[in-house]
């Protein structure tokens, strides 16, 4: 089984992202099949964007829109079987009470219904500060919202002191999208706390080959193949420290070296 690999534009300089053709050139030149990070607010805008991507043999992944119905329709038109619901955020970064969980889950339910109507899997980002942040959050939220799918983000799970492989082993058939990235911290032998104000002074997301917190990238990808995962794997690196063309090329080359 072949995994489909996309480049995510999170962290790319605005002057590059605003030049869509330049984005396509970089992504295609680095060897990716798709690109994630674009949005559209009308069918006409989507047509222009999709036509440009097609010139480079690229697929548009998880296209965003402010409107839930528009997002569902745009993605199903592209043949995407999954798209992202709007993130629900924890209050003050703490785990919600049962009542607060119900309050946060409420706005997600109509989004789940809208996406499901069109055969689009509604996924929520596993992300620091959001409703889904840790392995324990996944267990609790999926029980409360059984129609929700996971955006499996390896970097955010690591930053939250959760093991991405635990999530993959427990919910292999509930993953609808993947953000693959690594995590680096100044002293990996000491337990880090992403909720401390100075956390990002000593920790960061990093190149796939650069992490020092135990992520086995090949094991993650092998696990997705074993689970017969049919979605996209987007390579993401928030706040890259080098030129994005070099970073995304190096990350793609790293995947090739481990068989992907």
Tell what function each PLM region has:
Residues 1-78, 147-149, 252-260:
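N-terminal pre-domain/capping segments
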Residues 30, 110-121, 145, 219-230, ...:
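A structural motif corresponding to the C-terminal end of an alpha-helix
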Residues 12-18, 34-48, 64-71, 92-95, ...:
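Acidic-and-aromatic substrate-binding clefts and catalytic sites of carbohydrate-active enzymes
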Residues 3-9, 35-37, 58-64, 83-85, ...:
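Hydrophobic faces of well-ordered beta-strands that scaffold small-molecule active sites
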Residues 59, 67-152, 159, 245:
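Active-site acidic/histidine proton-transfer and metal-coordination neighborhood
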Residues 115-210:
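Acidic/histidine-rich catalytic cores of soluble enzymes
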Residues 20-24, 43-50, 68-73, 105-112, ...:
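Generic structural signal for well-ordered alpha-helices
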Residues 231-258:
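C-terminal/domain-terminus segments
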């Amino acid at each position: 089984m072949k995994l489909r690999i996309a480049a995510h534009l999170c962290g790319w300089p605005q002057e590059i992202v605003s030049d869509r053709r330049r984005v396509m050139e970089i992504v295609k030149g680095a060897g990716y099949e798709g690109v994630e990070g674009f949005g559209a607010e009308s069918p006409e805008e989507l047509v222009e964007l999709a036509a440009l991507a097609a010139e480079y043999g690229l697929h548009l992944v998880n296209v965003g829109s402010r409107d839930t119905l528009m997002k569902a329709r745009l993605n199903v038109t592209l043949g995407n079987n999954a798209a992202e619901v709007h993130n629900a955020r924890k209050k003050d970064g703490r785990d919600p009470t049962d009542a607060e969980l119900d309050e946060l889950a409420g706005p997600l339910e109509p989004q789940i219904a809208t996406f499901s109507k069109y055969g689009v899997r509604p996924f929520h980002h596993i992300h620091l500060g959001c409703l889904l942040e840790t392995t324990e959050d996944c267990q609790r939220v999926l029980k409360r919202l059984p129609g929700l799918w996971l955006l499996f983000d390896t970097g955010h799970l690591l930053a939250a002191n959760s093991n991405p492989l635990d999530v993959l082993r427990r919910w292999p058939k509930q993953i609808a999208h993947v953000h693959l990235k690594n995590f680096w911290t100044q002293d990996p032998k000491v337990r880090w706390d992403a909720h401390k104000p100075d956390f990002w002074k000593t920790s960061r997301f990093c190149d796939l080959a650069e992490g020092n917190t135990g992520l086995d990238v090949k094991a993650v990808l092998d696990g997705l193949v074993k689970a017969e995962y049919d979605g996209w794997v987007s390579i993401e690196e928030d706040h890259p420290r080098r030129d994005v063309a070099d970073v995304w090329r190096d990350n793609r080359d790293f995947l090739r070296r481990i068989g992907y």
